[in-house]
Amino acid sequence: MKLLDGKKCAESLVADIARKVAGYEESGLRKPHMTVILVGEHAPSESYVKSKIKSCGNAGFEGTLLRFPDTITEAELLEKIRGINADPTTDGLIVQLPLPRHINQQHIINAIAPEKDIDGFHPTNFGRMTLGQKAFRPATAYGICKLLQFYEIPVWGKHCVVIGRSNIVGKPISIMLSNDFDIGNATVTLTHIETPRELLLDETRRADIVIVAVGIPGFVTEDMVKEGVVVIDVGINRLEDGKIVGDVDFENVKKKCSWITPVPGGVGRMTVAALMINTLMAYQNNFDLV
């Protein structure tokens, strides 16, 4: 069993981005600029946002955090987004999710200019990604692809089972791995927590790669996978004792794995790295550098 070290991979990707940014600065261009909007106080969101801003510094970017109280109205937040959309010095915009209940999340996602939507959630980017066209790919799914690529895990022609159908992870990773592009051409089965148990077991036990994102601690157990499987655990769950665990029963499942991601230290780092890649792409688009 070997670990798919997201920290090591992310640091390599961000260092490569920093070298490119240094070259652009030497030619007289400004730094890439990411803006993150955080509404209200939500401990996990605070942690995610801090890691994004820190990674901006490591990549040579400018990172701006805009905080708003959870009393902000949807109309007020939309107005803030329109202002950032019109700002030529901001390349990428993230609105940290989740949002307060009185704000329609999809309205906010749809309001972000597609050319600044580095999360890859806007329908325009999601549609282009689905069609295999150039787009900002959803960051967690893109990060998983980059992790597989970094460790040279074969994907072409492999049987991949995705557990979880969210628009953030499950759906985009199933599309990306089945598309004909640099890390794809797998045969993908998309399952979820409503998939009948026996059907789920039938699929996972035949899978070469299992990717799970359901938010249930220890959901994937040793009996669900075959020898030599590659397991990607997207889950981040905090237990009552404060311990952070994934959706995989790590200590038992790892016995059968050829490769497995740890939690923490796996996919989370790759999500942030993918946001840096998308921000660089937005910046390059703005200056016609690609």
Curated annotation (Swiss-Prot):
Tell me if Hydrolase is a UniProt keyword of this record.
yes
Q: How does it assemble?
A: Homodimer.
Q: Binding residues for NADP(+), per the UniProt record?
A: G164, R165, S166, I193, I236
InterPro entries for this protein? Aminoacid_DH-like_N_sf, NAD(P)-bd_dom_sf, THF_DH/CycHdrlase, THF_DH/CycHdrlase_cat_dom, THF_DH/CycHdrlase_CS, THF_DH/CycHdrlase_NAD-bd_dom
Superkingdom of origin: Bacteria
What Gene3D superfamilies does the annotation carry? Leucine Dehydrogenase, chain A, domain 1, NAD(P)-binding Rossmann-like Domain
Per its UniProt record, what CDD domains does this chain match?
Answer: NAD_bind_m-THF_DH_Cyclohyd
The UniProt keyword set, sorted, is: Amino-acid biosynthesis, Histidine biosynthesis, Hydrolase, Methionine biosynthesis, Multifunctional enzyme, NADP, One-carbon metabolism, Oxidoreductase, Purine biosynthesis
Starting at the broadest rank, the lineage of the source organism is: Bacteria, Pseudomonadati, Thermodesulfobacteriota, Desulfuromonadia, Geobacterales
Role according to the record: Catalyzes the oxidation of 5,10-methylenetetrahydrofolate to 5,10-methenyltetrahydrofolate and then the hydrolysis of 5,10-methenyltetrahydrofolate to 10-formyltetrahydrofolate.
Annotated Gene Ontology cellular components are:
cytosol
Similarity annotation: Belongs to the tetrahydrofolate dehydrogenase/cyclohydrolase family.
The pathway is: One-carbon metabolism; tetrahydrofolate interconversion
Pfam families, from UniProt?
THF_DHG_CYH, THF_DHG_CYH_C
Question: According to its UniProt record, which reaction does this protein catalyse?
Answer: (6R)-5,10-methylene-5,6,7,8-tetrahydrofolate + NADP(+) = (6R)-5,10-methenyltetrahydrofolate + NADPH; (6R)-5,10-methenyltetrahydrofolate + H2O = (6R)-10-formyltetrahydrofolate + H(+)
- GO terms, biological process: L-histidine biosynthetic process; methionine biosynthetic process; purine nucleotide biosynthetic process; tetrahydrofolate interconversion
Q: Which GO terms describe its molecular function?
A: methenyltetrahydrofolate cyclohydrolase activity; methylenetetrahydrofolate dehydrogenase (NADP+) activity
What is the name of this protein? Bifunctional protein FolD 1
Q: Organism source for this protein?
A: Geobacter metallireducens (strain ATCC 53774 / DSM 7210 / GS-15)
